[in-house]
Amino acid sequence: MAFTLTILVPCMVLALVAARPVLYWVLSVVIDAFLRWKYPLPHHAGSKPMPRARYTWPNGQGTEKFFNGRSAARQWRQRWGPIYQIWSGWCPEIVLTTPTHAVQFFRNSHRHTKAVNNDSGWLFGEVLGVCVGLLSGTDWKRVRQQVEDGFSRPTAARYTGDLVFLAREYLQNTLLASSEQSLENKGIIHVEPAKTLQFYPFLSVAQILFGRLSPMQRTQLTTLAPLREELFKEVIRGGINRLSIAPWFKSRGVRLLNEFQTQWEQFVEDAYHAAVKRNQSPRPLVIGLWEAYQAGTISKRECLQTLDESLYANLDVTTHALSWNVLLLAENGEAQTELRQEVLSALQSEASESYERYIDRDDTFLAACILESARLRPILPFSNPESAPEDLYVDGYLIPANTNVIVDAQAINIDNPYWVNGTQYNPRRFFSLNKSDVRHNMWRFGFGPRQCLGKHIGERMLKAIVAEIIRQYVISISADSALKNDLQEDSWVGLPATRIQCVPVGREVEKN
């Protein structure tokens, strides 16, 4: 008997392993047929039906859209054309790839509805499903009222001085501490921007949300970051985490969720009480949000998830924007030199207010560098899904009411004929382009009235830290970086793994 089991068990295991691809294929075919029946795409007689991807078990194209989105977007566009439909889990998403299509669809975006749980399933909903950025209609207006003043352009301008100070402090302390130096190359440092610079925007936003942070609060927030990052990777991987039955299986995603939520709620409540005691101005956003929850205006989940969205959900987003800005300048010496001259000229004024206003302006070469990086390296390959309340025709194709639509950011920002030599880094292009045309031909904060709430603060953070780096260092790609555009493994936003060399400006002059 024992001998028989010794033979039988390995054979059964091998059979299951061999049968898995067949089982996945069968599931894919059956579910694809069901979804096409459930979500038909009508078309006029004599016109071509909209191209549709085949559903593949278990996430459709949902996981590929995040982890392999940039290459997938090009392949899908070449295969299916300028408008096509994919599956995010069991949810259909229509992809628009031209600015003309996007303008047509987003013309009435104030009436659009954000996709439930971002079309990413149950676990996503538990993490960010009711944050302000994913609410719609009256719920969106109700929660947005609690935070919009704190992120407005006038309020953002009040933070510029703090952001400049934090940038200088961060470079002086954190950059040097996390760099590689030697006695022979004193002052010359080697860093990986995506790892070294990530906590500057993170701590800057945390200070706006919670007020001046104590050393203990800083430690708590930065310690929570890896846990939150692992949790979101489980969200993107999908599978069982897409289903509301996931808690029954005690998956890794569920365990991480429970651990994070417990610590996050405790931190937010403690931070609220600490902020009330400090009574600082401007008033930290946590006070208004927590008091709105206590008054019953918003729920505790809406409060906690909106704070999470502003801080942790944007950690990889801001890190992506900052690190690619630095790397593109490291690759383009002429632009770097021009920017350094502009920054030094702005610093010549004795009044600190004038330098802060320089950071605020959107007509500088610094602002153009930030824009060009955002154009060339979109943070996400596709926008978040949303739907219109009525049927719409785009380029002859019918988009049925309440069908979610996403935008191929790479197609609009780079491959779009509007951008002459679109694959090349050229910040000066923005000085000769009409601002209205740029808005319609570049996907960054979204189209229409529902744009990213934090864009004004985000712009100032990027400009403050990039200006400070270029003022202090001549940067270049490190010789030991294997690939210039190598990416971190498992990064859902395409964080670069490239290292740079930073030579103090004075030392560079001496060498020359």
Swiss-Prot record:
Enzyme Commission number: 1.-.-.-
InterPro entries with a match to the protein in the record: Cyt_P450 (IPR001128), Cyt_P450_CS (IPR017972), Cyt_P450_E_grp-I (IPR002401), Cyt_P450_sf (IPR036396)
Superkingdom as given in the UniProt entry: Eukaryota
Keyword Metal-binding set for record: yes
Database matches in SUPFAM superfamilies: Cytochrome P450
Residues linked to a glycan: N118, N421, N434
A Pfam family this chain is assigned to: p450
Any one GO biological process: small molecule biosynthetic process
Keywords, sorted A to Z: Glycoprotein, Heme, Iron, Metal-binding, Monooxygenase, Oxidoreductase, Signal, Virulence
Pathway in which this enzyme or protein is active: Mycotoxin biosynthesis
An example Gene Ontology molecular-function term: heme binding
Annotated binding of heme, by residue: C452
Keyword set includes Signal: yes
Signal peptide (from-to): 1-19
Cofactor: heme
Protein family: Belongs to the cytochrome P450 family.
Function field: Cytochrome P450 monooxygenase; part of the gene cluster that mediates the biosynthesis of gliotoxin, a member of the epipolythiodioxopiperazine (ETP) class of toxins characterized by a disulfide bridged cyclic dipeptide. The first step in gliotoxin biosynthesis is the condensation of serine and phenylalanine to form the cyclo-L-phenylalanyl-L-serine diketopiperazine (DKP) by the NRPS gliP.
Name of protein: Cytochrome P450 monooxygenase gliC
